[in-house]
Design a protein with these regions (language model features):
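Surface polyanion/phosphate-binding segment centered on an Asp-His-Pro turn
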Residues: 62-70, 100-102, 127-129, 164-167, ...
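Short phosphate/oxyanion-binding micro-motifs
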Residues: 1-101, 123-124, 222, 226, ...
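Conserved pre-catalytic core of RNA-dependent polymerases
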Residues: 341-344, 406-634
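A conserved non-catalytic segment of reverse transcriptases
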Residues: 198-201, 214, 378, 658, ...
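Short, conserved micro-motifs composed of acidic
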Residues: 15-16, 148-165, 406-410, 605, ...
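Metal-dependent phosphoesterases centered on the DNase I-like endonuclease/exonuclease/phosphatase
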Residues: 1-28, 85-176, 226-228, 232-236, ...
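Short, charged alpha-helical motifs in flexible N/C-terminal segments and linkers
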Residues: 272-379, 413-470, 476, 548-553, ...
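Extended C-terminal regions of large enzymes
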Residues: 786, 800, 812-1023
Length: 1023
């Protein structure tokens, strides 16, 4: 609590940015009054009601803190006798339904004239004093500092001129029911104010927070004394343990580093704390001395010097907290730093479990019981389960691709120090370390000192097939998911692993990742380079569109595996790797880092005992996603090869499953046998892999001709739910119609943008800062939708942009036009985003994917229904209005919009054609018959593609006889041939070279012409 804060509405956001938590203000002016209550970001709380004085005199809260509800009041009383003020405050506090009350502040009066005041006039009790005393008696309130220091003569305010006066004007009144919860109450000298601070320490929540585990203070890494100490420690430890094996030596080095780091930090803290105590005592001594007699000039100088020194130390400590809170970003020009853009997430995540439901009727809050239950839960979860032998399951399958000999050789090369150094360089900073407390920053600073010992430890581990003791250990930290947080299943376990383990895991992951791109079907888009999450979403739209167009009854099956990463069986992973012919050496390396793995659970700073792991891939390990998708590819192969499952056949390719890591969707015709076979396939896979279907979250959605019906088949799996939508797939809520899906998802984006704007509107940002937030934070809510959904309506785009503009100008009059805002800064704009342009640029990226990937995987519908292949289509000179000519079937809306955008960017009018002879004849909006572009498959199949293919070497046209001689397999008549020749513009016939190609008039956020050129030049030319 602060009083006489001089806060105003203009300074509010500055204070909040610096504090990092929540502040409830009652503003005064910049020169008078103002009071507020600060709530630390880590304190779990809920404000039920707040009463705020408009004149800056009080803030009164009905608040729940750590599960305890109470009334909290910060008071700044007038400096005259104002009984009406105290009556008002009393009535407001008593109007709140709480019997626990804490009222603190500057009351501008003393309660006991004999103990709380010295000097000045000893008046009888004022009317205000009487009101306070009566209220204390009637409401069971006590002056807690006086209660704990009954005979102390300590004051919180002093006046030296014209009359020497000392008073205790600042105090806390608390309910007597809270006395047993008080840890301490003390007065500490002020150094920036004429008031001393009153500190009340109260333990509302009986939960005692543990010490947690040691983590290196990264500030030490910039301290030369610390660096020299650690270098010396490493050398001494190595000299003393020369005979130890490399693993034992490495662990010993880490233990020695930890010991010296703790010692260094403790010494620094002890020295600082000792100096603070010394200065406080000196200030207190001089203050007490001044109550009896005026200080000499020398003593007055000592007092001011002590206050200045104390202020400096406190400021240094505050600066550390300030930096840790990431508030310094506001003073660094709102740079594009992750910590700046994480304000939305900061402090919003509940990180500890204070209550837990262990049965239908019992909720526990005792930390020991909670930790015990957590340990039992995760020990059981990660214990190996008896499963069916996977050999039978795998023997019925054939891998489409396996690791070849060349890949095996590359994958199993010996590790090198340079490879380790590269991995360390790539790893992200500012991440929580594992149990040894050493972050990645430590490895970078001391790399030259430790590299040989770390390298030898890895070599020894892989040779002996066992990591060092510390490398085997992980600390499970829990993050909340959706749902009831009293249930442990609604918390996600993230394992904090030691950095030396993560480096080795990353080295292995980097090697196998390259191979996975080759052996994993493109139906799996998770974690692999050149795979895109939106690919699955677009595929779902394509399948739904195909079923609609062909009146096909089908179902979309969304399967949820319960704790999929945590339950996957290790033996099944090894068997899966053998199935794909991974070399034994790499499998043994992975087995080595899993052998003897242990974890403990941390909660509220307490840590459980370590327990052994027997299954699951740890979330937090660089290898985990790749091991998981190797195992889940077995599921996909089994579904594709299962003849009882009837998928959707599009363009010769049958779609049965789409995957993103553990997120799986199956597709089947509306047929009982096929749907039952699908679920049985998932079930059989679970029997050998450990995966368990969560039927509560698994759904069947009707699509195609039955999308609006309530049809269902009587399945063998009774728990599965039927629906017409929505089904959430990778963040997109799918309904049975495109219109409903598109509208719903963009409306949800609008809600998220609104919520984010509410958060950011409280921050004091410059215009450039707001533009950064719009382009980075707000626009990010939209990007994934624009990338994989049909374009938003014009009205929706306008609504979104209006929200951005209102945020930019704080809902006030716009100072700059939108057209000017969208220009770049070199043209005096602000780079304000144009949603329509951003949408176009994101959809253009799909053109590159179509060209650089297996087109049949990206879009089997397009691949089957376009008249020409993608390589040819994207060289055709089509107008947007002629796009319909490229396919005999109606294009799905997403692809129609994407190809229209390409046409806008790519089309060149006749006078823009640079080399007419090189122009493609077909699907060319400059070459038409009967107002339609031309495409004659027979001619195209006989390599007649460009204008030059109908010309002689001297650039004159082939006559009909010459044409038939050159292309004997083309069966067209004389009239048809000459109609084609006559359709070619005269400019082409004259081989007139036009102007240099103009750049597209579209002001795309990326240069689409360059993008087009980049795409085209990466592919072989059409001959």
């Amino acid at each position: 609590m602060t009083q006489e804060a001089h806060s105003t509405k203009d300074t509010e956001s500055d204070w909040e940015n610096t504090w990092g938590g929540k502040i409830i203000f009652s503003h005064g002016t910049s020169a008078a009054r103002g009071t507020c209550i600060f709530i630390k970001s880590t304190v779990q709380h809920e404000v039920h009601k707040k009463i705020i004085d408009s004149d800056g005199r009080y803030v009164i809260l009905d608040i729940e803190i750590e599960g305890i509800r109470l009334t909290l009041a910060s008071i700044y009383a007038p400096n005259n006798d104002s009984p009406e003020f105290f009556i008002t405050v009393r009535n407001l506090i008593e109007s709140l339904p709480n019997d626990r009350r804490i009222s603190g502040g500057d009351y501008n009066l003393v309660l006991d004239l004999t103990k709380d005041k010295k000097g000045g006039q000893n008046k009888t009790k004022t009317k205000s004093q009487k009101i306070i005393c009566e209220w204390m008696n009637n409401a069971d309130l006590i002056d807690i500092w006086r209660h704990m220091h009954p005979d102390s003569l300590t004051y919180t305010w002093s006046q030296k001129r014209p009359t020497r006066v000392f008073c205790r004007l600042d105090f806390f009144l608390i309910s007597t029911s809270l006395v047993d919860d008080i840890v301490s109450a003390k007065i500490v000298p002020g150094f920036r104010s004429d008031h001393s601070a009153v500190i009340l320490e109260i333990k509302l929540n009986k939960t005692i927070r543990g010490r947690g585990y040691w983590k290196l203070n990264c500030n030490h890494l910039s301290n030369l004394e610390y660096i020299n100490t650690i270098k010396r420690t490493i050398n001494e430890t190595v000299q003393m343990n020369k005979e130890s094996n490399p693993n034992l030596l490495w662990d010993t080095i880490k233990i020695a580093i930890r010991g010296e780091s703790i010692k260094f930090g403790a010494t620094q803290k002890k020295e600082i704390d000792k100096e603070i105590v010394r200065l406080e005592k000196e200030i207190q001594r001089l203050n007490e001395l001044s109550t009896n007699t005026p200080l000499s000039d020398t003593d007055e100088g000592y007092l001011q010097s002590a206050k200045t020194s104390l202020c400096t130390i406190i400021n240094q400590k505050a600066q550390g907290a300030y930096v840790r809170s990431r508030a310094e970003n506001y003073e660094e020009g709102e740079k594009n730093k992750s910590s700046f853009f994480n304000i939305e997430k900061r402090n919003s995540t509940k990180k500890s479990v204070n209550k837990l439901r262990i049965s239908k009727t019992e909720v526990i809050s005792d930390q020991n019981r909670i930790l015990d239950h957590m340990k039992t839960f995760y020990k059981t979860l990660y214990s190996q389960k008896k499963l069916e032998n996977s050999n039978t399951f795998l023997s019925n399958l054939s891998p489409p691709k396996t690791v070849n000999e060349e890949q095996s050789i590359i994958m199993t090369k010996d590790l090198t120090i340079d490879e380790i150094a590269a991995a360390i360089k790539e790893m992200k900073s500012n991440k929580s370390p594992g149990e040894d407390g050493l972050p990645i920053e430590f490895y970078r600073i001391f790399w030259e000192d430790i590299k040989i010992y770390l390298f030898e430890s890895y070599k020894f581990s892989l040779q002996e097939k066992s990591l060092s003791i510390t490398q085997k250990r992980g600390v499970i930290s829990l993050l909340p998911k959706k749902g009831d947080l009293l249930m442990l299943k609604n918390w996600r376990p993230l394992t904090l692993l030691n950095v030396d383990y993560k480096i080795l895991a990353k080295l292995i992951a980097t090697r196998i990742k390259k191979v996975l791109l080759y052996i994993i079907n493109e139906d799996q888009t998770g974690f692999l380079p050149k795979r895109f999450i939106g690919q699955n979403i677009v595929s779902m739209f394509e399948i739904m569109n195909f079923c609609d167009e062909n009146e096909l009854a089908a179902v979309l099956i969304s399967i949820d595996f319960e704790k999929a990463f945590d339950q996957i069986d290790w033996d099944f992973i090894w068997d899966s790797m053998n199935f794909f012919k991974f070399p034994p050496k790499i499998i043994n390396w992975i087995k080595t880092i899993y052998k003897g793995a242990q974890s403990c659970v941390t909660n509220n700073g307490h840590m459980s005992e370590y327990f052994a792991l027997g299954r699951g891939v740890r979330q937090g390990c660089p290898l985990s996603p790749y091991l998981f998708i190797i195992a889940s590819e077995i599921l996909a192969i089994s579904l594709r090869s299962n003849e009882l499952i009837k998928g959707i056949l599009i363009g010769g390719k049958e779609s049965k499953i789409k995957q993103f890591a553990d997120d799986s969707q199956a597709i089947s015709i509306f047929d009982k046998e096929s749907i039952n076979a699908t679920f049985k396939n998932f079930e059989d896979y679970g029997k050998v892999s450990g995966s368990v279907i969560n039927f509560d979250k698994s759904k069947l959605m009707r699509i195609g001709s039955i999308k609006d019906s309530l049809f269902a088949v009587d399945l063998d799996y009774k728990d599965v739910k039927w629906t017409n939508g929505p089904i959430e797939i990778l963040g997109i809520n799918f309904y049975s119609t495109f219109e409903e899906t598109t509208k719903y998802n963009y409306e949800k984006v609008l809600e998220k943008i609104d919520k984010a704007i509410q958060t950011w509107s409280t921050q004091k940002l410059t215009l450039f800062g707001k533009i950064s937030v719009i382009n980075t934070v707000l626009l990010s809510k939209l990007i994934s939708k624009l990338s994989s959904l049909p374009s938003p309506s014009t009205d929706m785009i306008k609504r979104i942009e209006n929200k951005f503009i209102d945020f930019l100008w704080s809902s006030k009059r716009h100072a700059i036009s939108k057209e000017m805002l969208t220009k770049n800064r070199s043209n005096f704009g602000l780079n304000f985003p144009c949603i329509a342009t951003k949408d176009k640029s994101l959809k253009m990226a799909w053109i590159k994917r179509l060209l650089n990937s297996d087109a049949d995987c990206v879009s089997p519908f397009l691949n089957a229904n376009l008249k020409v292949g993608f390589d040819t289509l994207f060289r055709c000179n089509l107008k947007k209005s002629d796009l319909k000519d490229c396919s005999d079937s109606q294009l799905p809306l997403f692809w129609k919009q994407t190809l229209e955008i390409w046409c806008e960017a790519n089309y060149r009018s006749i006078d823009q054609i640079e080399n007419p002879n090189e122009e493609i004849l077909w699907l060319n909006s400059n070459i038409k018959l009967d107002h339609k572009t031309i495409f004659i498959k027979e001619m195209f199949d006989n390599n007649i593609v460009r204008v030059k293919d109908l010309q002689k070497d001297d650039k004159t046209w082939l006559n009909f006889d010459s044409f038939r001689t050159k292309y004997p397999n083309v069966k067209i008549n004389f009239l048809h041939y000459h109609r084609i020749i006559n359709a070619i513009p005269i400019e082409y016939k004259n081989n007139r070279k036009g102007n240099d190609p103009k750049k597209t008039a579209l002001a795309f956020s990326l240069c689409l012409k360059k993008f087009q050129k980049l795409i085209i030049t990466t592919h072989k030319p059409i001959t």
